[in-house]
């Protein structure tokens, strides 16, 4: 503690309060040796570090696949992960044509207004899905947004069965999105890849083609992450 106090130039009493708070959160651990407290990193901090490193690896492995998907569809492509029961976008590939409404990297959205979000929770264990649907309050962004947990559950069953999610203006009027799951080597869904576009280009005639290309991209990404069906 004295070393931390000297290096950070803050009083020992403040250091002690900070360390005890971090200890309660399991980010550090205390080991008394010969009557002196020795502090080291806790398991939760190590888990957090591993989680961030795995996301960095994911972005690196999937980036070329995202670029190819964006080129094939001429649409905006995103990569999202589940974080705090919401979808958090960790990467994207933009096209030259403008898209007025989209989620930036680092932003988080409720799962009911995001195709990626629906994909990420559709494959959760039953008890985890039950908890999420009972605890979350789902916003109604547009008249097309589904907010009822029972209706969402039915939609999620369809997502699981068909292997993709379709957001038809649930996030914003005039915006459509198709997402598919990325699996890791254990068979768990670790991310979702999606194509987003406006009604002007994301027409009804192109939906079937987009579904096929997004699912193909997700399958390629899953193989890169070690998944073998």
Question: What function would you assign to each model-found segment?
Answer:
Residues 1-60, 224-227:
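N-terminal helix-turn-helix
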Residues 12-15, 42, 117, 129, ...:
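Alpha-helical structural signal
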Residues 34, 40-135:
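Amphipathic alpha-helical effector-binding/dimerization core
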Residues 130-131, 136-137, 215-229:
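Cysteine/selenocysteine-centered motifs that mediate thiol-based redox chemistry or coordinate metal-sulfur cofactors
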Residues 144-217:
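Extended hydrophobic
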Residues 8, 19, 45, 66, ...:
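Short amphipathic alpha-helical/adjacent loop interface patches that line ligand
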Residues 28, 91-93, 193:
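Short hydrophobic alpha-helix segments
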């Amino acid at each position: 503690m004295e070393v931390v106090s000297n290096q950070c130039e803050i009083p020992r009493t403040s250091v002690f309060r900070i360390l005890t708070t971090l200890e309660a959160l399991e980010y550090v651990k205390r080991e008394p040796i010969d009557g002196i407290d020795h502090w080291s990193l806790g398991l939760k901090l190590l888990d957090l570090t591993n989680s961030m490193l795995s996301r960095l690896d994911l972005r690196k492995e999937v980036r070329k696949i995202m670029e190819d998907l964006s080129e094939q569809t001429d649409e905006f492509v995103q990569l999202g992960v589940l974080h705090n029961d919401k979808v958090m976008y960790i990467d994207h590939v933009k096209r030259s044509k403008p898209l007025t409404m989209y989620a930036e990297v680092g932003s988080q959205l409720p799962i009911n207004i995001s195709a990626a979000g629906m994909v990420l929770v559709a494959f959760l264990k039953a008890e985890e899905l039950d908890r999420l649907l009972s605890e979350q309050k789902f916003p109604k962004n547009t008249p097309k947004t589904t907010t009822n947990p029972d209706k969402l559950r039915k939609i999620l069953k369809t997502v699981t069965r068909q292997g993709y999610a379709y957001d038809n203006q649930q996030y914003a009027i005039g915006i459509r999105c198709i997402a598919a799951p990325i699996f890791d080597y254990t068979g768990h869904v670790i991310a979702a890849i999606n194509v987003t576009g406006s009604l002007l280009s994301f027409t009804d005639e192109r939906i079937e083609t987009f579904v096929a290309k997004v699912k193909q991209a997700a399958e390629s990404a899953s193989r890169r992450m070690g998944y073998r069906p």
